[in-house]
Amino acid sequence: MISAPDVVAFTKEDEYEEEPYNEPALPEEYSVPLFPYASQGANPWSKLSGAKFSRDFILISEFSEQVGPQPLLTIPNDTKVFGTFDLNYFSLRIMSVDYQASFVGHPPGSAYPKLNFVEDSKVVLGDSKEGAFAYVHHLTLYDLEARGFVRPFCMAYISADQHKIMQQFQELSAEFSKASECLKMGNRKAFAGELEKKLKDLDYTRTVLHTETEIQKKANDKGFYSSQAIEKANELANVEKSIIEHQDLLRQIRSYPRQKTKIPDLQPGDTEHTQDQADQVSTTSNPEESANADLYTCRPAYTPKLIKAKSTKCFDKKLKTLEELCDTEYFTQTLAQLSHIEHMFRGDLCYLLTSQIDRVLRKQQPITNFLFEDFVEVDDRMEKQENVPSQPSQDRLPPKPVEECPIPKVLISVGSYKSSVESVLIKMEQELGDEEYTGVEATEARSFDPQENLDYLDMDMKGSISSGESIEVLGTEKSASVLSKSDSQASLTVPLSPHVVRSKAVSHRTISEDSIEVLSTCPSEALIPDDFKASYPSAINEEEAYADNEGAIHFQASAGSPEPDETQEGNLENIPSQIDSSCCIGKESEGHLVPLPTPAYTLSDEDSVVSIPPQRYIQKDQGLHVDFGVENTDPSPRDNSCEMFPAYELDPSCLLASRDVSKMSLDNYSDTTSYMGSAASTSSDRIPSAPPAGLSSERHKKRAGQNALKFIRQYPFAHPAIYSLLSGRTLVVLGEDETIVRKLVTALSIFVPNYGCYAKPVKHWISSPLHIMDFQKWKLIGLQRVASPANVGTLHTLSRYSRYTSILDLDSKTLRCPLYRGTLVPRLADHRTQIKRGSTYYLHVQSMLTQLCSKAFLYTFCHHLHLPAHSEETQEAVASRQTSFLKLNLGLVNEDIRVVQYLAELLKLHYMQESPGTTHPLLRFDYVPSFLYKI
């Protein structure tokens, strides 16, 4: 056998060094030139046309009769936008053909000039030399001093992407037509004003000439006309002819077709003013009589002057600017519309098409949109629905959408659905004065095996330790009873009063032996010993299903209300019994129904506050009723992306009809023991605070997406945190720095499902101790950590309710939450993603959540999954069929099933309520182990 030294002996020293590899030279005819734009940061999205401008812009040009084609202004008005792009040359290109050519002057058989109202021309031009493509919108403005009274202009949207111009031609045409109509309307107004001034000048000149002629006649004793008299007579004749011509022009400009004066972008006041003006024009035929009824008379008094008599065929070469040709108000509005167009079509074609398709698809999916939909789009759809007449024509019935299908009697009650996550039954009594109310249904309990989760513990996380059993908070059921139309209901309708004295209601717990014993024996901060792991399942199996309401949670929040079962039966008698096989759930017809505002609080003799549950729909003739609406504080009338909600956070539990009415949260129902040891526990932190400005703006989406990307890449346990949000488990973000906490809460809010279309269940910042009902209201909470004795109560309550929530500690970089082993969240939040832009990642999240909502919709509205096939089929068989459908048909595994089940529960709750989004789901608990993740 040859050893290594023997091998080395037969080698040379220079053989250890690798010789450099020299590629053979290619002939010149086979050589490929370098990419000419490699120095500009070549990537698949680089502009290959070599355009000299960095972004799209709008150019306004004119074909001047004095200097020819010339650029007037650009939008945005910044030289850095178009760079070295030759605006003069491109203006010559786009204005080389007169697309607005028409005869203006004395037509055959007419003694006076005639104005032709020419339609706009729309063309697409390309310049390969400049690497620019443009949508060009040609229009004609009128100028009294111009040749033929016309001034040709054009507005061009210039881009380096030819496909973008061609694909968006219809949208560009529609938007530029709005700007053109606004500009032309202002031009007609200014042109009519110039004609009026000219007529006043001519009338004054005629009066002066008449006076001078009479003086000359009196001074003439010879009996024949002098040369001066003849000159004055000719000048007077020219003035008379000019007056007739200008009056005819004024009549023509006033007779512009009324239907063309309707501009969608005008403000309501402007539109009404325009219509009134058009009405006056249509009823006025004599130009001299229309001086007081004309639409162009509201202007300062004009002092006439003496002008040189000449025909209107002679023109002054002093031309007006574009701003002078148009009324100031209309010109400003036109520039605003053009700025909106530039912002609207900003970005590449892929982004524009994706956004347009997204908007179209969201309008077609109103059933699941409330879960993750932007509030702006919801408001737009609600406004459109309000504009639809409530009673359509009888001869043609509109098609019924899915959500308007009649409710089958067999599916009326929420109890007919078995929850996908069974609950542990706890009973809580709430004392409010002398009257009590019970309105919560009892559900069964199911055991959970923690050993299965322990076996699948992710070994990549450092220091993962198991805590005590955890109770998952899952909102699934309705929390308020349905009040029937009765005398008692009418008595509850009290006038809204802003002067209400708030007092805390007293609450206590009635502890059941089964459920609370398990809750109190194992603190969440303790580690699970070995002997406890074996006894853990047996402790859970001791939970039995209650046949009645004994041992269940009861929140008694009503005063003198009827029983829930009787109320539901009374309200559901009028529901049609027709069953549609295409859908298994629906809503009542809302043609004659209006929402009643949540009543204020009734002052009792003991000076305490009695909370009345939110009223359902009542008949219009039944007392006070107010239609709810979401305020819009955004001054922009056009850009919907900048719309925002009021300056206070909307409480998902109830929306009062007035902001002046005192707001009452669900703190009255909270556990009073959380106040122990906290001197700083006040109600000030419970008052809804101002959310970040522009919740649905593009800037908010970009920042939220960017911060979410940072969170995913910085924290290796991001997947369990996101799973907690998607599955309905409240996530508490704990930290000292308010700015950091708010940023992270805003970023994680894109993963939080909504209860309704009014507000997300997110609390960005709170400093007082948490109550148990806060976990029902808020699914994402930012909690303050302060190193002071006053904050001991906050940490105490957080430790007490830690089994109800997932806790993300930003200071210690830890997360305590249940284990996640699914495949959905890794695709939703991949730390190795190549996405760099926050807005792009936001669209990615919306796309994934839309797919998730479609699965939840399919699971929710399938008859055979939730109803027994026959009377003898057990609930275990139904649950097995549901699980099989989720795994085999929808391709879900492990914890992904819990996410879809939670979304399905929200869908059921949303469509079983007559006024969705105004109440909270109930607290529902499930035993799951929590694990501590560390970095």
Swiss-Prot record:
InterPro entries cross-referenced by the UniProt entry: FLCN/SMCR8_DENN (IPR037521), Folliculin/SMCR8_longin (IPR037520)
Extent of Polar residues compositional bias: 277-289, 677-686
Annotated keywords: Autophagy, Cell projection, Cytoplasm, Guanine-nucleotide releasing factor, Nucleus, Phosphoprotein, Synapse, Transcription, Transcription regulation
cDENN FLCN/SMCR8-type domain boundaries: 318-833
Gene Ontology molecular function terms on file: GTPase activator activity; guanyl-nucleotide exchange factor activity; protein kinase binding; protein kinase inhibitor activity
Superkingdom of source: Eukaryota
Residues recorded with modification Phosphoserine: S416, S467, S470, S488, S491, S497, S788
Post-translational modification: Phosphorylation by TBK1 is required to promote autophagosome maturation. Phosphorylated by ULK1.
Tissue: Widely expressed. Expressed in the forebrain and hippocampus (at protein level).
Renumbered residue ranges of the record's region Interacts with WDR41 within the C9orf72-SMCR8 complex: 860-912
KW Signal (keyword) present: no
Knocked-out gene: effects: Cells lacking display impaired autophagy induction.
BP terms from Gene Ontology: autophagy; negative regulation of autophagosome assembly; negative regulation of exocytosis; negative regulation of gene expression; negative regulation of immune response; negative regulation of macroautophagy; positive regulation of autophagosome maturation; positive regulation of TOR signaling
Region (Required for the homodimerization of the C9orf72-SMCR8 complex): 1-349
Cell compartment(s), UniProt: Cytoplasm; Nucleus; Presynapse; Postsynapse
Modified-residue entries (Phosphothreonine), positions: T794
uDENN FLCN/SMCR8-type domain boundaries: 48-220
Domain dDENN FLCN/SMCR8-type: 842-908
PROSITE patterns per UniProt: DENN_FLCN_SMCR8 (PS51834)
Region feature (Disordered): 257-291, 383-402, 677-699
Cellular component, GO annotation: Atg1/ULK1 kinase complex; cell projection; chromatin; cytoplasm; guanyl-nucleotide exchange factor complex; nucleoplasm; postsynapse; presynapse
Function: Component of the C9orf72-SMCR8 complex, a complex that has guanine nucleotide exchange factor (GEF) activity and regulates autophagy. In the complex, C9orf72 and SMCR8 probably constitute the catalytic subunits that promote the exchange of GDP to GTP, converting inactive GDP-bound RAB8A and RAB39B into their active GTP-bound form, thereby promoting autophagosome maturation. The C9orf72-SMCR8 complex also acts as a negative regulator of autophagy initiation by interacting with the ULK1/ATG1 kinase complex and inhibiting its protein kinase activity.
Family: Belongs to the SMCR8 family.
Subunit relationships: Component of the C9orf72-SMCR8 complex, at least composed of C9orf72, SMCR8 and WDR41. The complex is formed of two protomers, each individually consisting of one molecule each of C9orf72, SMCR8 and WDR41. The protomers homodimerize via an interaction between C9orf72 (via C-terminus) and SMCR8 (via N-terminus). Within each protomer SMCR8 (via DENN domain) acts as a bridging protein between WDR41 (via C-terminus and N-terminus) and C9orf72 (via C-terminus). The C9orf72-SMCR8 complex associates with the ULK1/ATG1 kinase complex. Interacts with C9orf72; the interaction is direct.
Protein name: Guanine nucleotide exchange protein SMCR8
Biological source species: Mus musculus
Organism placement in taxonomy: Eukaryota, Metazoa, Chordata, Craniata, Vertebrata
